[in-house]
Amino acid sequence: MADNGTITVEELKQLLEQWNLVIGFIFLAWIMLLQFAYSNRNRFLYIIKLVFLWLLWPVTLACFVLAAVYRINWVTGGIAIAMACIVGLMWLSYFVASFRLFARTRSMWSFNPETNILLNVPLRGTILTRPLMESELVIGAVIIRGHLRMAGHSLGRCDIKDLPKEITVATSRTLSYYKLGASQRVGTDSGFAAYNRYRIGNYKLNTDHSGSNDNIALLVQ
């Protein structure tokens, strides 16, 4: 190490040689999370990705706070304070939107840091909730050998005659209704159907299924 406390090029080279294997594993894990960690592909990797995203917020905020406390000069200190405020406001807005979505859907998927759009499908006496990346005008449902897939998510066994008449897509501000449109059976246990959006408003899910299965939303006063 040099007299002024910095490391030399040779020392940096030796450090990289010693940590190359660890760095390679870190980049491999990052690649796997970015390429394969999707909710409709690998649920285990997706949960790890969500935990990683949750941890990034407090770690990032702590870095900017420490940079402000142990500032190099007043310019970097001011930048660190500004960035800490921005990150804090972004983190707060995430919690506000998540709790609003949770109040609407009562699903823990509301705290997903990747998206605040949730698909809600009433099936077999309960509401199955899955995350969506965007809200579409038409949502397709495909049944292959008795297994239902909707918007890329596997929802379990279902016959085409048992498809719900209505599904919803919830955000922190709105709830969109989708009505079952055209459907077609293929063979004995396969088929496909399309749900068309026909209404959008400030609603919340009705989790009481003692009545009709079609009544799955209540107006938020």
UniProtKB/Swiss-Prot annotation:
CDD domains to which the protein is assigned, alphabetical: SARS-like-CoV_M
Chain ranges on the Virion surface side, renumbered to this chain: 1-18, 71-78
UniProt keyword list: Glycoprotein, Host Golgi apparatus, Host membrane, Host-virus interaction, Membrane, Transmembrane, Transmembrane helix, Viral envelope protein, Viral immunoevasion, Viral matrix protein, Virion
Intravirion side: 40-49, 100-221
Molecular function GO terms recorded: structural constituent of virion
Cellular compartments per GO CC: host cell Golgi membrane; membrane; viral envelope; virion membrane
Function: Component of the viral envelope that plays a central role in virus morphogenesis and assembly via its interactions with other viral proteins.
UniProt miscellaneous comment: Bat coronavirus HKU3 is highly similar to SARS-CoV (SARS-like).
Subunit (UniProt): Homomultimer. Interacts with envelope E protein in the budding compartment of the host cell, which is located between endoplasmic reticulum and the Golgi complex. Forms a complex with HE and S proteins. Interacts with nucleocapsid N protein. This interaction probably participates in RNA packaging into the virus.
Record gene name: M
Entry's family note: Belongs to the betacoronaviruses M protein family.
Name of this chain's protein: Membrane protein
Annotated PROSITE patterns: COV_M
Subcellular location as annotated: Virion membrane; Host Golgi apparatus membrane
